[in-house]
């Protein structure tokens, strides 16, 4: 048989039963080894080849061992980003439904003129807001007297370094500390006590009362930190040792050079509750940054007010009769309905205070350390959350309450319990006094 006839017969022997001619090329599993049509073929032949390879019913789709995406297998790493996006969409849709339902049921409840801003509240609130910082000046006078006494002790020790003189100076130092500590405590109690008394009995608007009480608490924290820190600075100056070594950052302003009104004034306005003679500073003020943060704060403050007036207030009013008759099912429904609104208000308030306002203040004061919070949203425990969401208060409690208690022999659990109790009392003061609703009273 001639070679041409033999080739034709072999070609027809592998026919697929269609009119598409077989392509004379090297194949692997019925396909060209390179996955493309053979070279040297025309356009019609290429189209026929692609059509035949596309509709092959013998393709091996199950060619390796695989697991389901949600299986708990060691080599399976599934991404749940789509579920997160779905939850965001559902959350937005549910809140839009609540907004529509609220407007259909109540209409527009926002009323600027309906707020009861009494003249007495405005006058007393303004007076308290202006006079409370005066207690910082009193603490400055106390520390100035203690610093003067410390300089005298250092001068006498340089003249006479005998043991008897050292013991006498140590007694003087301890007496000075106890006297200054007494006046600092009295000053702090007056700052917080007078403000709390006036707000509880004479200021009826909770917003004005909260601002006054918050400033009194901040000033009280700053007075305590100012007193404790300068006490240790005096100790380090009078008794220099390895144990009393100071941080290197303090070298540019040694004690008692830090006892000035300018130094205390900076601490008063700085966004921190922990006193240091020196803070890390930024090189310049970015006024555009300040404007953006203040704009964010203003917008979020208005947003919180709108949510409170339009959504939170009606739910609370409608809950009074349910609580009176102890309708448990209705109470639970109101609590869950209010929880969404409360969460949004809390998140907006957190961003407005810790991100917008404190960053704007830090920029104006050129305050460098702006870690006012960390990623509390990733907290795996309640303790981690407390340490993350409000860093200024956490650092104050750790430096002036927790660490001294542990240093005096308290167990970490007992010290943490003391910090928790003190924090709970102060939160009750901040919330209960302006709203005239102290627990147990």
Which ranges hold each PLM region?
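Membrane-proximal N-terminal segments immediately preceding the first transmembrane helix
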Residues: 34, 42, 51-75, 98-114, ...
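Hydrophobic alpha-helical cores of multi-pass transmembrane domains in eukaryotic membrane proteins
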Residues: 87-99, 126-141, 182-196, 212-224, ...
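Membrane-interfacial catalytic/cofactor-binding modules of polytopic membrane enzymes
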Residues: 249-296, 318-435
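Intramembrane catalytic core of multi-pass membrane enzymes that act on lipidic substrates
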Residues: 5, 12, 29, 34, ...
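Noncatalytic N-terminal accessory/assembly modules of large enzymes
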Residues: 1-148
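Membrane-lumen (extracellular) interface motif
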Residues: 96-125, 144-151, 173-179, 195-211, ...
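Conserved, structured core domains in eukaryotic proteins
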Residues: 79-102, 213, 223-226, 232-242, ...
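A broad "ordered helical/assembly scaffold" signature
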Residues: 48-50, 198, 202, 218-220, ...
